[in-house]
């Protein structure tokens, strides 16, 4: 696990397992929502995450390159996330959640509520 600002980041796969085990939502775990009830058990689907990342990018009219610059990564990494070849890193997912005020549960395909 990486440390950022003195806090350990939980890999999304492990966070999903934790949320499934205790019926929590991810937004509660990262501290952006007070409601803690989860919405059932879910597995991470890299293609769904990629689709939602693309949807978010289109909604805010930004290119893969612009998102890559925001996350301090490469355009090819964003492309790999969007195509579902790779699951997005927790640190990148959190940056997106905080910058665009979207739900981590939505980004990870656990709810249809974007906010």
Residue ranges and their predicted role:
Residues 13-28, 91-106:
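DNA major-groove recognition helix of helix-turn-helix/homeodomain DNA-binding modules
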Residues 11, 25, 63, 74-77, ...:
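Short coil turns linking two alpha-helices in DNA-binding domains
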Residues 28-37, 106-115:
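Short amphipathic recognition helices of helix-turn-helix/homeodomain-type DNA-binding modules
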